[in-house]
Amino acid sequence: MSAEIVHLEPGNLQHEYGLDTQRLQPWAVLNAPFESSWALARPRTRSVLHSHHEHEIFIAIRGSAVIECDGKRASFRAGDIAFLRPGLEHRLLNDGDEEFMFYSVWWDEEMAEKFIARNREEVPA
């Protein structure tokens, strides 16, 4: 058995929330209680200020940026992980001259319930 791998395709990114992204799902082999995506903040760009009902984690991969949450700013650079609570208004700012790449993972109760239901179907009794 070998690992299932999804490759980042920089030439095939979609524009979402003011960032260039590549979502992991749908991925037929993965039953997960979350959704996720690669995200690339181009130099001198900002994501759209927004909030949502999901929990979310950002994992900084390359470069540095600033996360703004409810009007407060914090530096965010490669190796850092940020947790964003549901309802928290947030955005990412890349005021630098280099690209900033991070990985975003989000989940909610409905995703967890669907995961449990699918998992019960997949595992023999």
Give each language-model segment a name.
Residues 40-41, 51-67:
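Short, conserved beta-strand element in jelly-roll/cupin
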Residues 71-86:
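Short acidic-glycine-tyrosine-enriched beta hairpin
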Residues 48-49, 67-68, 84, 90-96:
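Short beta-strand His + acidic residue motifs that chelate non-heme Fe in jelly-roll/DSBH
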Residues 45:
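Phosphate-centric recognition/catalysis
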Residues 39, 83, 98-114:
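A short hydrophobic beta-strand segment most commonly corresponding to one strand
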Residues 1-34, 48, 117-125:
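A short, N-terminal "cap"/entry segment at the start of jelly-roll beta-barrel domains
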